UniProtKB/Swiss-Prot annotation:
It comes from Methylococcus capsulatus (strain ATCC 33009 / NCIMB 11132 / Bath). Pfam families: Histidinol_dh. Substrate binds at residues 242, 264, 267, 333, 366, 420, 425. This is Histidinol dehydrogenase. It catalyses: L-histidinol + 2 NAD(+) + H2O = L-histidine + 2 NADH + 3 H(+). The keyword Amino-acid biosynthesis applies.
Length: 436
């Protein structure tokens, strides 16, 4: 087994900042060819609707149907998939869904208002989105957890109609994905994928209804399409490769740390796994664990490439410095594998999800802990948050003026409007002023 060459950094090095920048750098292939093809696909769907959808589904998914209506999956197929699940799988899926739902319930925003002395009422009205599109990657390697994480918060928010798009290569669908759609309350399912599915959801066809927002992960074509339709519809986020950052005080079993790093590195070659510790001997022990455990992994080659290309081990002087480096990285997943995580977490400002303590494996959050696994990547945790109920609700401002309120506010508004040279604004306010 050849050595796994993982980049080593030390905060004491003069060029540490630039070394860290190089380690974190990831430029999504701004492939003009892909951009062009996706633009063409979106144009086809906008122009030809159902006919284009049927043709593109046959071309890209090798799934041939006579009409677009045949792309929709009857609701009883979802129920049958759920009923046919082995009891243990059904129990695990239900438990995960219930935990995600319980967490999401606490995120709900409520409308509020307050009244001023003159009777004027000001407030905020919370309304769920009318219709949301959920994209789910298809084929055999499907992700039922992704269905739960996207669908359950939408339903908790009160979204009346949830439309799922899932590609069916050669007509094949994953039963677990359909079962997850059933128990999380998905309303309609279309067997469509790629940029053509995103375009159909964004603009609508004769058969596929137009949605207000599109959520869910996908390949580079799906991500590019989501970017291009943003503005026509809302999107959740443009996700980069998966990331994990582990801060260890040196007292966690090195095998545990190695496997936690593997858990993200196995996603794909661009995934990033980084370990930070003030204990140099611990970094060596984890390196040894990596080399011992890697040959037994199912996705050993992907993990090796990911660790050698984008992995890192960072030696720091103390845990406070570790927190400062973590804030600079702003990771998607952050594990605090330390004695007192509740103390260290106070220093963390930028992270998608924070896993506190040695026993809290990031994988638990991926599947069933409760918090959402759709998280900001590529440093966007500096200004973004995990997917949640609030992503499926919108806020409207409420203003009600009593006659007295209109009199008072009208005088202020009139002065400001004339100052801006907007006479109609000023007069509109003045008409409601009481002339005593």
């Amino acid at each position: 087994m050849t050595e796994v060459k993982i980049k080593r950094l030390y905060t004491g090095d003069a060029d540490f900042a630039s070394q860290l920048d190089r380690l974190l750098a990831w430029s999504e292939s701004e492939d003009t060819d892909i951009h062009q093809r996706v633009t063409e696909i979106i144009g086809c769907i906008r122009r030809d609707g159902d006919a284009a959808l049927v043709e593109l589904t046959a071309r890209f998914d090798h799934f041939v149907v006579d009409t677009a209506a045949a792309l929709e999956l009857p609701r009883d197929v979802l129920e049958a998939a759920w009923q046919a699940l082995p009891a243990e799988q059904a129990k695990a899926l239900r438990e995960a869904a219930e935990r995600i739902r319980a967490y999401a319930e606490r995120q709900k925003l409520d409308s509020w208002d307050y009244r001023e002395a003159d009777g004027t009422l000001l407030g905020q009205k919370i309304t769920p989105l009318d219709r949301v599109g959920l994209y789910v990657p298809g084929g055999k390697a499907a992700y039922p957890s992704s269905v739960l994480m996207n669908a359950v918060p939408a339903k908790v928010a009160g979204v009346p109609e949830l439309i799922m798009a899932v590609p069916a290569p050669r007509g094949e669908l994953n039963a677990l994905v359909l079962a997850a759609a059933y128990i999380s309350g998905v309303d309609r399912v279309f067997r469509i994928g790629g940029a053509q599915a995103v375009a159909a959801l964004a603009y609508g066809t004769e058969t596929v209804p137009r949605v207000d927002k599109i959520v869910g992960p996908g390949n580079i074509y799906v991500a590019t399409a989501k970017k291009l339709v943003f503005g026509q519809v809302g999107i959740d986020m443009v996700a980069g490769p998966s990331e994990i950052l582990v801060i260890s005080d040196g007292r966690t079993d090195p095998d545990w740390i190695a496997m936690d790093l593997f858990s993200q590195a196995e996603h794909d070659e661009d995934a990033q796994a980084i370990l930070i510790s003030p204990d140099a001997a611990h970094l060596e022990a984890v390196q040894a664990s990596i080399e011992r455990l890697l040959p037994g992994m199912e996705r050993a080659e992907v993990i090796r490439t990911s660790l050698e290309r984008r992995g890192g081990m960072i030696l720091v002087d103390d845990l406070e410095q570790a927190a400062a480096v973590a804030n600079r990285i702003a990771p998607e997943h952050l594990e605090l594998s330390v004695e007192s995580p509740e103390v260290l977490v106070e220093s963390i400002r930028n992270a998608g999800a924070i896993f506190m303590g040695r026993y809290t494996a990031e994988a638990l959050g991926d599947y069933c802990a409760g918090p959402n696994h759709v998280l900001p990547t590529s440093g966007t945790a500096r200004f973004s948050s995990p997917l949640g109920v609030y992503d499926f609700q919108k806020r409207s401002s409420l203003i009600y003026c009593s006659p007295d309120g209109a009199d008072q506010l009208g005088r202020t508004a009139s002065l400001l409007a004339w100052g801006e040279g907007l006479g109609a604004h000023a007069r509109s306010a003045e008409y409601r002023i009481r002339h005593h």
